[in-house]
Each structure stands twice: as structure tokens, then as C-alpha cells.
Amino acid sequence: MNVKRKATLKFGICIGLLCVSFTGFNSLFGSTHAEAKSIENTKMTSCITNQKFVQLEKKFDARLGVYAIDTGSNKTIAYRPNERFAYASTYKVLAAAAVLKQKPIEKLNDVIRYTKEDLVTYSPITEKHLDTGMSLKEISEAAIRYSDNTAGNILLQQLGGPKGFEKSLKQIGDHVTKADRFETDLNSAIPGDIRDTSTAKALATDLKAFTLGNTLTTDKRTILTDWMRGNATGDELIRAGAPAGWEVGDKSGAGSYGTRNDIAIVWPPDRAPIVLAILTKRFTKDAEYDNALIAEAAKVALDDLK
């Protein structure tokens, strides 16, 4: 075999592996022509979708992690699904879910008191209730709907601190997410630092377990998803990239190095829901994030799942 032919062959194999389009394997598994054509079209769509994510990274000069699960068809969309990103405030919905798992619903009415010294930057709800305290339900709602950082810290404290939160995720099968610090230190997002990081796949899988699986009882799942549907910080994110008429419940996050994240449940009309996690980061500490990157990545993923 000459060198030119060998190089061409290697290139062809690489392309075949990248787009997973070896139709020659169909006969080995007894696929009909129609089935083979359907499988090939699905795989080629995934390859095209992958390239769209590459282009978004170039357009926004950012790094992107995406994982989507269509719970009706079990089809997944994945782009850098196992790469670590700072999770930022997305943890708040998972921490609230873990608290729901641990406590009877009536305990959500327990009043939690805190002091001025407990307040951290960006606590728009908890700072208004220093004199009276807030119920655990109100604190959870403040953390999810308004991304209140003091509320987030209180949820972590309810779980035994960041490591208690990490343990609660391990109990549902997540051995990837690393939780180490409270607000607001957890948003530092220093490249190479695995503290307070996760992956798009891990976060999407956790969210699916809490909102659509049997980890929580039906009444607790309803409480959690109602909080997510009322999120006031996500209108420019996954919600902006979803088709008209598709309902979105989400939890956003932001941090240093242009970190901007959103994890969501998406309810298309008359179909099973879709779980979607989009994590992004840039390359300098003071880089600004761009909400449009999340919205456009969501559109790419959800269009592929239409």
C-alpha cells in the first residue's frame, strides 16, 4: 500500500468513526434497508449537530459542554459531555432536591434563622428577612427562582456542607460532581481546579433523577419542578432557544472565566420531557459571558430532538 493510499484510508476511517456511519455493519445485525437508512440518518444528524457546536465555540470564543436526554426516545445529544466545568449556581436546584429527599414535606415549613454575618453577595431575598427568618420552602424557592446566594449556602448547610451535598449526589449515582466550597467562593472557576465542578452529563443525569425518576415522591417532584418553572433568571438562556410552545423549567449559573450555565427540563407539547444541561466557559478570569451562546446551543440541541 502506498503512503498516499494509506493516508486516505486513515482519513476515511476517522470520518467514519466521527460520524458513526459504517452502514456495512447493518448486515451483521440483520437490519432491513429501511432500518439501516433510519439509523444512518440519525447518526449523520448527530455529526451535523456536533459541527454546529464546534462553530458556536468559534463564534463565541468559548468552551461548551452539552448533554440532552429525550426521555421519550432515549436519544441523547452530547458535546464534550464529560468535560469538567464549574457548576456555579446550577447546584442550587440539586441541593434543594437533595433537601426535599431528606426531609418530610411538613419540614419545609420550619423557619430557618440567620444573621447579617451570614449574608453574602447577591442575596436579594434573604437580605429582606433578617428579622423574621424564612421557611425552608421559601429558602429553596429563593435559591432556585432568584439564585439567592445566602439561600444556597443555607441549603448546603442543611445537607451537612458542600461534602454533604456531594454525598447526596453520590447516593443517586453521581460520582463525578465535586463540591468543596460555599458561596461565593465556589464560583472562582479557575482552569484546572476541579473543586466545585461537574460535567454536562452528570448534571443532566442528576436533574433527570430528581425531577423525572423515582428519587423523589410525586408530590416532591411537583414542588421542585414548579420552582424551576418559575425561575426568574433564565429567560435569555435555554428558554430563549426552545421552540414556541415548549415549556422550560431551569436553573442558571455564572462565575469567573466567563462561566455561564443552564440546566433544564423542557416539556414539548404532547411529548415526554427533555433534560438539557449546557455549560460554558471562556479563557480569561475577567471574561464576560454571553447568554446568546446558551440560547443558540439550546436551539441546536432541541432542533435535533424535534
Curated annotation (Swiss-Prot):
<dbReference type="GO" id="GO:0008800">
    <property type="term" value="F:beta-lactamase activity"/>
</dbReference>
<protein>
    <recommendedName>
        <fullName>Beta-lactamase</fullName>
        <ecNumber>3.5.2.6</ecNumber>
    </recommendedName>
</protein>
<dbReference type="GO" id="GO:0030655">
    <property type="term" value="P:beta-lactam antibiotic catabolic process"/>
</dbReference>
<keyword id="KW-0046">Antibiotic resistance</keyword>
<comment type="similarity">
    <text>Belongs to the class-A beta-lactamase family.</text>
</comment>
<feature type="binding site">
    <location>
        <begin position="251"/>
        <end position="253"/>
    </location>
    <ligand>
        <name>substrate</name>
    </ligand>
</feature>
<dbReference type="InterPro" id="IPR045155">
    <property type="entry name" value="Beta-lactam_cat"/>
</dbReference>
<keyword id="KW-0378">Hydrolase</keyword>
<dbReference type="InterPro" id="IPR012338">
    <property type="entry name" value="Beta-lactam/transpept-like"/>
</dbReference>
<comment type="function">
    <text>This protein is a beta-lactamase with a substrate specificity for penicillins.</text>
</comment>
<keyword id="KW-0732">Signal</keyword>
<dbReference type="GO" id="GO:0046677">
    <property type="term" value="P:response to antibiotic"/>
</dbReference>
<dbReference type="Pfam" id="PF13354">
    <property type="entry name" value="Beta-lactamase2"/>
</dbReference>
<dbReference type="InterPro" id="IPR023650">
    <property type="entry name" value="Beta-lactam_class-A_AS"/>
</dbReference>
<dbReference type="InterPro" id="IPR000871">
    <property type="entry name" value="Beta-lactam_class-A"/>
</dbReference>
<feature type="signal peptide">
    <location>
        <begin position="1"/>
        <end position="34"/>
    </location>
</feature>
<feature type="active site" description="Acyl-ester intermediate">
    <location>
        <position position="89"/>
    </location>
</feature>
